[in-house]
């Protein structure tokens, strides 16, 4: 797997341990990973802060990919999707991970640290990063999402 851009990653306190495992896995594959935090456990941190930081970083670095982690994956996904240009997908299995990229052109993968075991999350990350947007009929659909976002 080769990436032309770094992979940005962030979590809240519940995703800190999984984030470390994902970073180690990706670095073993010689991928450039930029950790946007947190770097230490703070049970009072707030997932929107990290989701917004990752989204802003990606907006400044077009065509990049990101990974967000919280307990369910729902909160970081909701927060990230508020940012223009972000197409975040909560994924809990490897098949959906591939389809999120192939059909929906997702650029942020959101993971659950509480309800998906680490080994499955690693498979999800690999599938997501290996998949490519297929375009075709999917371009029209994703285009509608982007057009709606621009109108608002």
Swiss-Prot record:
Domain of life: Bacteria
InterPro entries referenced in this protein's UniProt entry, alphabetically: RpiB, RpiB_LacA_LacB, RpiB_LacA_LacB_sf
GO biological process, one term: D-allose catabolic process
Record's keyword annotation contains Amino-acid biosynthesis: no
Associated pathway: Carbohydrate degradation; pentose phosphate pathway; D-ribose 5-phosphate from D-ribulose 5-phosphate (non-oxidative stage): step 1/1
Active site (UniProt): 70 (proton acceptor), 103 (proton donor)
Keyword terms, alphabetized: Carbohydrate metabolism, Isomerase
Matches recorded under Pfam families: LacAB_rpiB
Transmembrane segments: none
Residues that coordinate or bind D-ribulose 5-phosphate: 12-13, 71-75, 104, 114, 137, 141
Gene3D superfamilies registered for this protein in UniProt: Sugar-phosphate isomerase, RpiB/LacA/LacB (3.40.1400.10)
Reactions catalysed: aldehydo-D-ribose 5-phosphate = D-ribulose 5-phosphate
EC code: 5.3.1.6
Molecular function terms, GO-annotated: ribose-5-phosphate isomerase activity
SUPFAM superfamilies, A to Z: Ribose/Galactose isomerase RpiB/AlsB
Biological function: Catalyzes the interconversion of ribulose-5-P and ribose-5-P.
Family recorded in the similarity comment: Belongs to the LacAB/RpiB family.
Subunit structure, as described in the record: Homodimer.
Name the record gives this protein: Probable ribose-5-phosphate isomerase B
Organism: Mycoplasma pneumoniae (strain ATCC 29342 / M129 / Subtype 1)
Gene: rpiB
